[in-house]
């Protein structure tokens, strides 16, 4: 009974981890882990994605029903807590559980609309509610970050900063993201200037210097992004090697430092989900207001000036589509802004694109799928490991071009 709440919080986290795995691969060997077993080394059995979703909804429902908020958590509270996500705040875990439930409900809205609405309404109408602010963002902090920022004061730097300065400078903007930053509003999306450098020599970027070139993205499938030369043509992620040794420095001018947290689910996403839920008549409220709230929440996270936020919102080219009678046009705008806000969580952006076909991405420049993915189409899932090719229980016909 002492660890009652801890048990159910781990179930919430487990459902979150399962969701990422099944959305990446489809059917997965879930039954072993649900039973607390290690799977055999060969010939494992797979659980269908439908049954995996059933299991996730069950885990979340049991956790939300059984957690006792007045008991708190025994992981310590605040910045020194062993809880790397929410600092021992049980109410934030409950709001995350509901928000995750809504995400999963929307994920199945095209294949099982009745179940999706049932689960979505439970999430929205729960006593504990959804995320309330950016303080509720589900995130993890790198070990290298100081203790007062949620880290351990040392250890690995497992984040985007390490990728840009440790792994060859190949983290550059996509052409699709460039298009979204430039074309959604009459003004450049202010998040672009926070997250990306202008194309510049890598040696200059090490000194936090950039050119006056326009921001530029790389087309999907371009195989010429090799090493440090890539930053001369395309915009790399905005970080500064000069502050990498100062783990206390979280400078908004160089967003991706070694101490920067990684956000897995945000308050902004929850507002965009409410916009879609209202569009589907799962809840009341203004679709357009939820949509605007999502944009504002995303920009608030990056501490963007109010005047820049308002100029961007005032300049939105298709805002009228969100409040219009054409639900497909409204969905397109909601998901496009959601996709922008989700960066750099690529897995979630990919999952939303596969679900909705939004945003409208540019054609792939080079298809290297060996026929798995039809020309002009996009990858739908990741292949199972090669070691599974001899497993008679492996789902048949599941290639990268199949949902």
Predicted features by range, described:
Residues 296-403:
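C-terminal functional modules
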